[in-house]
Design a protein with these regions (language model features):
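Substrate-binding groove/exosite segments of carbohydrate-active enzymes
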Residues: 22-170
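Contiguous transmembrane helix-bundle modules in multi-pass membrane proteins
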Residues: 10, 15-22
């Protein structure tokens, strides 16, 4: 009985949380889709570790240690990723893509603005960004080019903060 009561309380809390986020004119079906989509975004956070220097050494492709083989991402040997990252799908696509991540932060900012902004800043850290300033595209080819959706998502998150009465100049 105590277990059922606790579960009932958590369900009521979740219902209240998502009700606050749902537009008042949304139908019951639209509200459920929104709730499930946002819950899916929260569920898709994953610990991600990829040490390119080590990976390139294992494939005899590290230009720093004299590797001779050609390999994808050979120019990203500086990269060591080890963080909790929002993934497109933890099962089918368990790696990040900066393009997807930028769009994830737009939805995530509705439920966890700090995590959303941290994700945007993460891609600009020295253990992610290339020395030439390029944001990594995705694991299979970090050097692919993406349109400036990262800048768009950053501005969007800043404007969302401002609309809630907060102005984080340091974030922008």
């Amino acid at each position: 009985a105590a277990f059922d009561a606790i579960i009932g309380e958590r369900l009521a809390e979740a219902d209240a949380f998502y009700a606050d986020l749902t537009p008042p004119n949304a139908s019951a079906d639209e509200a459920m889709v929104m709730r499930q989509a946002l819950a899916g975004m929260l569920w898709s956070k994953q610990y991600y570790l990829f040490d390119l220097d080590c990976w390139l050494d294992e494939h005899d492709a590290n230009p720093i240690s004299g590797g001779k083989r050609a390999a994808r991402n050979r120019d990203w040997y500086h990269m060591v990723n080890e963080h909790i990252i929002s993934m497109p799908d933890k099962w089918e696509y368990p790696w990040y893509a900066a393009w997807d991540l930028a769009f994830h932060t737009i939805a995530l900012s509705m439920v966890d603005v700090d995590f959303a902004q941290d994700q945007l800043k993460l891609m600009l850290r020295d253990s992610y960004i290339h020395p030439n300033g390029q944001i990594p595209a995705y694991e299979w080819n970090f050097g692919d080019v993406n349109p400036p959706v990262h800048a768009f998502a950053t501005l969007f998150n800043f404007v969302m903060d401002r609309s809630r009465g907060e102005t984080d100049q340091r974030f922008i």
